[in-house]
């Protein structure tokens, strides 16, 4: 027989996040919403289409990259900040940036990567070189690395549709 304790005898520990943590979470949630909206997606896509041919994989950073980076910040970061100010009373981008440095390990990789494109030139350049590689069909293709190996023999052979239906 199981001995059940009443709830008032249980020792519950309640963790309460600070107001600053809660505010940070609200901002991140709003950023996720904003970057998924059509308006932000259109702004970013149009910007990438306009300039992606300027960027290459070379180690050298061309002088032409600087005005493009500044324009990107002016258009996309300002749009993001404007949306956050409209949605969150008293929002301050400088305070958020400071808070982001303290919480960067808690932020989703995609969100952090996108935010870094506003402050880290190399992240910005990488975004463009990745976009260009994808546009030119040089994206990462893992399909050629897949091999089906038989458990009955040591020879490897590709899986054909007829073999797949036989194993079902």
UniProtKB/Swiss-Prot annotation:
Its main location: cytoplasm. One of its GO terms (cellular component) is nucleus. It is found in: Cytoplasm; Mitochondrion intermembrane space; Cytoplasm, Cytoskeleton, Microtubule organizing center, Centrosome; Nucleus. Gene3D superfamilies: ADP-ribosylation factor-like 2-binding protein, domain. The keyword Nucleus applies. InterPro entries: ARL2BP, BART_dom, BART_sf. The keyword rRNA-binding does not apply. Keywords: Cell projection, Cilium, Cytoplasm, Cytoskeleton, Mitochondrion, Nucleus. Plays a role as an effector of the ADP-ribosylation factor-like protein 2, ARL2. Belongs to the ARL2BP family. This is ADP-ribosylation factor-like protein 2-binding protein. The lineage of its organism: Eukaryota, Metazoa, Chordata, Craniata, Vertebrata. The gene is arl2bp.
